[in-house]
Amino acid sequence: MTVFSRPGSAGALMSYESRYQNFIGGQWVAPVHGRYFENPTPVTGQPFCEVPRSDAADIDKALDAAHAAAPGWGKTAPAERAAILNMIADRIDKNAAALAVAEVWDNGKPVREALAADIPLAVDHFRYFAAAIRAQEGALSQIDEDTVAYHFHEPLGVVGQIIPWNFPILMAAWKLAPALAAGNTAVLKPAEQTPASVLYLMSLIGDLLPPGVVNVVNGFGAEAGKPLASSDRIAKVAFTGETTTGRLIMQYASHNLIPVTLELGGKSPNIFFADVLAAHDDFCDKALEGFTMFALNQGEVCTCPSRSLIQADIYDEFLELAAIRTKAVRQGDPLDTETMLGSQASNDQLEKVLSYIEIGKQEGAVIIAGGERAELGGDLSGGYYMQPTIFTGTNNMRIFKEEIFGPVVAVTSFTDYDDAIGIANDTLYGLGAGVWSRDGNTAYRAGRDIQAGRVWVNCYHLYPAHAAFGGYKQSGIGREGHQMMLQHYQHTKNLLVSYSDKALGFF
């Protein structure tokens, strides 16, 4: 067991500044109108730094810097951009523990998750896209003996990126790595709930990039996010967050006819077929962990398996075992490596989760585990902690339909394969899903029949850089991860060349 020291305390791996500025043009720049807001840690609820409350004037400054850098960066050789991305990955890797502590203090997640997933995945994404851009090739088509079509990949230019509060550092990597690899410059706006860890990241890697290639502007959605997304000076906007905000982002972008990538909400089904209990072996244990994945990152994951569908033949036995597994989840100090469940990212989010607990009760759903705010004592009592909660009910309830974004799972049963698929697809969303079966044919069929962009089969919550991620239905537009993501940040130019000396003969 290791308990990391809190930022700024004796023996700490990192310290936060008491006041941050925006990162624009390779420099730390104060907000134009001199406004700041307090940023509390969800671990204790106490403020620990101030962050710029930026507005359109600051966005314009960042766009000036990004446009100044765009021509030079866009013309660098792919190998040069790849080398810089690899240096960023190395710098993150070297400071992994410090970045994990920074992320915990800003977001509230347990440090074991940040060390095992968030930071290594950020490294993985920079390294992957460094390799992908070097491997990307154009295309040549011979139209006839004298005519050739060349296809080139060219950067879009300046892109706007708005990231959520559930994985601040990782989401910055998801957005920045492909955009930079493709030769774009970026203006990034972190979520106002978790602005500090991305600023700490920039303090570590900012010197590796030419000035203006990456610019970070903080602030609230209406004051900074809207001016960025609606600007006619960006060539694309990429957004991760809730579906309602995604609709607004799409409206803003539509006025300028620019492309969008949207990764939005989810209400992911996690299906357990009867054969998972054919034996009480490693596979069964893995499936029970798969059920409990609804509590990973405090349920603050767009693909949270927040609907569990258990085949009726094993419903009672499996649910009993799953409840035991869930009740064994350890809550405590997020900086303790033994802690499995940290705090919600904000008090507002905690209150939202608690409101859905009441909604579930009013609908007649039954709580079989959790259901209350977690009281941890000491100075953690001011933090935003929630017990992992299991409801049982029916798929027509609001807790089955609406995204809660907390450690809450709604459980129901199904009779057969068709019933399972029907329940799974009875949702507005289609971001993720899980399928658990020892039968390969069943697992494959279910994976194909579920209407979701990412279906985990006999696993859950794996996010490798080289696997495409994105949603069906109201869960978004476009994909992240995988080399295909490069094309979301590129124009395709066709150069159609005739090598014939002869006229076409029309006139």
From Swiss-Prot:
NAD(+) binds at G219, F220, G221, A222, E223, A224, G225. Its EC number is 1.2.1.3. Pfam families: Aldedh. Keywords: Acetylation, NAD, Oxidoreductase. The modification N-acetylthreonine is found at T2. CDD domains: ALDH_ACDHII-AcoD (cd07116). GO terms for biological process: symbiont-mediated perturbation of host innate immune response. InterPro entries: Ald_DH/histidinol_DH, Ald_DH_C, Ald_DH_CS_CYS, Ald_DH_CS_GLU, Ald_DH_N, Aldehyde_DH_dom. Transmembrane segments: none annotated. It catalyses: an aldehyde + NAD(+) + H2O = a carboxylate + NADH + 2 H(+). Gene3D superfamilies: Aldehyde Dehydrogenase, Chain A, domain 1 (3.40.605.10), Aldehyde Dehydrogenase, Chain A, domain 2 (3.40.309.10). The active site is at E263, C302. It comes from the Bacteria. One of its GO terms (molecular function) is aldehyde dehydrogenase (NAD+) activity. One of its GO terms (cellular component) is plasma membrane. Belongs to the aldehyde dehydrogenase family. This is Probable aldehyde dehydrogenase.
